[in-house]
Design a protein with these regions (language model features):
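Bacterial N-terminal signal peptides that target proteins for export
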Residues: 4-25, 35-36
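C-terminal segment of classical bacterial N-terminal signal peptides
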Residues: 30-39
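N-terminal segment of the mature folded domain
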Residues: 42-170, 311, 318, 347-349
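Short beta-strand->loop
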Residues: 49-51, 142-144, 162-188, 202-206, ...
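Sec-exported extracytoplasmic/periplasmic mature domains
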Residues: 62-71, 94-98, 107, 114-118, ...
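Short helix-loop capping/hinge motifs at secondary-structure junctions, enriched
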Residues: 145-151, 170, 183-191, 268-276
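Ligand-binding pocket segment of bilobal, Venus flytrap-like solute-binding proteins
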Residues: 188-254
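Extracellular/periplasmic juxtamembrane helices and adjacent flexible linkers that interface
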Residues: 269-350
Length: 350
């Protein structure tokens, strides 16, 4: 082989070696990249969109559920919470808030989500007790000594009284208060005209309409506006824990059963891949541990065991339901709280 041929052969050999080395490098790098970009087992997170006065409850429920899930599955998860007026929360979910679960204080705010296709129309059949793992009722909180001598619903319509109630258009708390006052007249043998007059007199006495129950509590306790606050039973107990004997709780002769329904927001949960965790989260509310925490936060549990255990925390109350008087939440909503309904006609006269 002459010198020129030898040089050409040497160049070809070295080029082939470089190509092989480069290919091997790419292969190794590719394996490294595949390893580097292998999907990690990220912690699943769910958001619970709830109503205004359940902050403290779910601050205890959430870590208890996370620990229970970890123990059963070995998986790490997180649960976040969002709070506001019940109807505001429903609207937020409709507008894009990615809550895998909702825990509301009235069925109508979940029905609205079903009407928008975010969850099934039969959502109330997905969990026990019409998907309501706990309930409460509406009571009064007065200043120390109850100086205005408030005892029952009719007292809230007396001239000169200042009553703090959240807005029934945005808050389930406000709707329950409105309906309880209305129904107190009907259940006592009164007419619709008399019920309307009481509610009209009551709202003449409302100096400010907060958007949710917690805002109303702040107005009454910290801004010191009003003679009486109408709110959920659990909220007044929390106020008494924080402020001691500065306030008194008054139970009216009759009040309303305020159920707290829950649901998996299927469209969101399926999009995020959180349905399994979301469903387990709501089932946890019915467990012994969940019902125990519910009762400790002065919400009335469904479990007979928990109800008996915490019986001293809950005064017997003569309760009626929205179904009893109105035939259901949809009918009550349409008649009283839809635009142009009874509340609008009453409040515009104020």
């Amino acid at each position: 082989m002459n010198k020129t041929a030898y040089v050409k052969q040497l160049i070809k050999t070295r080029q082939r070696q470089r190509r092989n080395t480069f290919a091997a490098t790419l292969l190794i790098a590719g394996v490294g990249l595949i390893a580097a970009y292998k999907p990690a087992q990220a912690a699943t997170g769910i958001l619970n969109a709830s109503y205004d006065v359940t902050r403290e409850l779910f601050k205890d429920i959430n870590p208890a559920f996370v620990a229970d899930w970890k123990k059963k599955t070995g998986e790490s998860i997180s649960v976040n919470q969002s709070h506001g007026g019940s109807s505001k929360q429903a609207r937020s979910v409709i507008d894009g808030l990615e809550a895998s679960v909702v825990t509301m204080n009235q069925a109508n705010d979940i029905d609205i989500l079903a009407d928008k296709g975010l969850l099934p129309q039969d959502w109330a059949k997905q969990f026990p007790n019409n998907s309501a793992p706990f309930y409460s009722t509406m009571v009064f909180l007065t200043r120390k000594g109850n100086p205005r001598q408030i005892a029952n619903w009719e007292d809230l319509g007396k001239p000169g009284l200042k009553v703090i109630i959240p807005n029934p258009k945005t808050s389930g708390n406000g709707r329950y208060s409105y309906l309880a006052a209305w129904c107190s007249v009907i259940k006592n043998g009164g007419t619709e005209a008399q019920a309307r007059q009481l509610v009209e007199n009551l709202f003449k006495n409302v100096p400010v309409l907060d958007g949710g129950g917690r805002g109303a509590t702040t107005t009454f306790t910290q801004r010191e506006i009003g003679d009486v606050l109408v709110t959920f039973e659990n909220e007044v107990q929390l106020v008494r824990q924080e402020f001691g004997d500065n306030f008194e709780v008054v139970y009216p002769k009759i009040s309303i059963l305020a159920e707290s329904p829950v649901a998996v927001v299927g469209k969101v949960a399926d999009k995020l891949g959180t349905r399994k965790v979301a469903t387990a989260y709501l089932h946890f509310l019915y467990t012994e541990a969940g019902q125990d925490l519910i009762a400790k936060h002065y919400l009335r549990p469904r479990s007979e065991v928990a109800a008996k255990k915490y019986a001293a925390s809950f005064r017997p109350v003569n309760l009626f339901t929205v179904d009893d008087v109105f035939g259901g939440w949809k009918q009550a909503q349409k008649k009283h709280f839809d635009d142009g309904g009874e509340f609008d006609r009453i409040y515009i006269k104020k």
